[in-house]
Amino acid sequence: MPQIFRIGPYIVYFWSNENEPLEPVHVHIAEGRATSNATKVWITSTGKALLSHNSSKISAQILNSMIRVIEANSEEIIEKWLSHL
């Protein structure tokens, strides 16, 4: 489970080789530590971040800020994702 970065109390991470067939690039966001019900954000090939679900119930204000950070770092995230395949 590579942690990509931390934003305050939240970690942004992905699971290595998650699901079969392998899902497209996405990250999970959780407070404190990785959990199985973390918020999920898809990352498009253009670097746009799209909310899949907010299972960890992060407030809209914080989540919107985090999505902007994810988009700003989308190249790094995609590189890390591809290096873990």
Where are these regions (language model features)?
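Negatively charged, low-complexity tracts enriched in Asp/Glu with abundant Ser/Thr
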Residues: 1-15
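A short, structured beta-strand/loop element
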Residues: 19-60
